[in-house]
């Protein structure tokens, strides 16, 4: 056996003995389930020429993008890390440098999938897979939102005013190269004295599994409480919906959507919360805080919720990918720590 291959085999065995998380993931999730949706968009069915380098396998490319999002890596960084890390190459089934896509290929494929809305389709595909595993409970849902930071723009005051008024699309038409680097969809906002720029991920999760069931992406200035109805589905009817104090006074909206509001109360000037209200809030928060675990995982294990791209279309694709990657890893956690939640398919 070649000495380098022998060394790699020993490294793989050592990683496995230590509990390689990507190996555990591969054993549980068959990424081939995503092939139909990926081939639909990426395979050039009318390409008859055999010249040039053959296309990379579509599932391989998605797994590269999956790794990139989970570890919060840029296009150049993911190429380097695949070359450098045995665990990445094992997960991808790659053995030689020639099999590794370069940064331009990664960007190109991700761009095609983003524009086509493919990450939404893959999220739905995996959600159906989870439903098939019995991970669909009707005991309550939780809604919350988190900022998705975007690259900050340097504009004049007049340009910012036009963007804020919704007329930013007409700016820089005489400078197309400059315009392609300008984000006219992202917005500034302030929360608890801290400024944020970019977008916002609004998510609905199941209270029992902490799996994300639906998500909506808006600019950062949209208040959390204005995105309730788009997240609620018919199957949620009659279930309790847990919300924090930021959704105060939205009881009627929740009821109109067919759910039972369970909203933490907020004290006001000259009207502080009573001891009873504080106790009620503590009880509600025991369930509501479970959604914080989701955003905590994204911020911690996935190196934050952010976009490196320009515009709402790519931001929506990025949040769809984030939610999909989170759900896949959450499914692995459930298998490991809460296997009783998974219904027997036998």
Spans of model-derived segments:
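Charged, often Cys/His-bearing segments associated with DNA-binding zinc-finger transcription factors
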Residues: 1-39, 334-346
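Basic, short loop/linker segments at the boundary and entry of helix-turn-helix/winged-helix-like folds
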Residues: 23-66
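Secondary-structure capping and boundary motifs in well-ordered enzyme cores
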Residues: 30, 52-60, 98-102, 283, ...
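Contiguous, well-ordered alpha-helical segments that form the cores/surfaces of helical PPI scaffolds
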Residues: 58-69, 84, 230, 296
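Polybasic low-complexity intrinsically disordered regions
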Residues: 80-83, 93, 101-255
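Phosphate-backbone recognition surface of nucleic-acid-processing proteins
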Residues: 89-107, 261-263, 269-276
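C-terminal domain-tail junction helix/linker
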Residues: 152, 318-323, 327, 333-346
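Helix-centered, glycine/charged polyanion-binding patches within enzymatic domains
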Residues: 164-166, 240, 245-320
């Amino acid at each position: 056996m070649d000495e380098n291959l022998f060394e790699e085999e020993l490294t793989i065995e050592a990683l496995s003995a230590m509990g390689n998380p990507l190996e555990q993931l591969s054993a549980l999730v068959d990424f081939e389930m995503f092939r139909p949706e990926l081939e639909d968009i990426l395979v050039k069915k009318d390409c008859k020429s055999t010249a040039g380098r053959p296309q990379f396998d579509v599932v391989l490319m998605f797994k590269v993008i999956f790794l990139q999002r989970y570890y919060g890596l840029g296009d150049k960084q993911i190429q380097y890390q695949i070359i450098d890390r045995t665990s990445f190459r094992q997960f991808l089934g790659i053995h030689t440098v020639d099999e590794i896509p370069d940064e331009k290929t990664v960007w190109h494929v991700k761009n095609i999938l983003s524009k086509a809305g493919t990450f939404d389709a893959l999220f739905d595909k995996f959600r159906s897979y989870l439903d098939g595993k019995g991970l669909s409970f009707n005991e309550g849902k939780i809604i919350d939102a988190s900022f998705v930071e975007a690259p900050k723009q340097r504009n004049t005051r007049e340009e910012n005013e036009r963007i804020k008024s919704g007329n930013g699309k007409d700016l820089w038409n005489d400078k197309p190269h400059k315009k392609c680097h300008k984000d006219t969809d992202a917005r500034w906002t302030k929360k608890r004295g801290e400024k944020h720029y970019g977008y916002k991920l609004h998510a609905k999760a199941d209270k029992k599994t902490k799996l994300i069931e639906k998500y909506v992406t808006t600019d950062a200035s949209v208040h959390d409480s204005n995105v309730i109805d788009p997240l609620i589905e018919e199957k949620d009817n009659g279930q309790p919906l847990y919300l924090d104090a930021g959704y105060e006074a939205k009881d009627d909206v929740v009821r109109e959507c067919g759910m039972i509001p369970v909203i933490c109360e907020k004290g006001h000037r000259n009207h502080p919360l009573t001891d009873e209200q504080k106790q009620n809030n503590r009880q509600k928060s025991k369930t509501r805080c479970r959604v914080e675990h989701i955003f905590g995982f994204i911020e911690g294990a996935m190196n934050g919720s952010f976009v490196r791209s320009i515009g709402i279309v790519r931001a929506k694709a990025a949040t769809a990918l984030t939610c999909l990657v989170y759900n896949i890893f959450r499914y692995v956690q459930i298998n490991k720590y809460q296997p009783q939640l998974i219904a027997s398919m036998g």
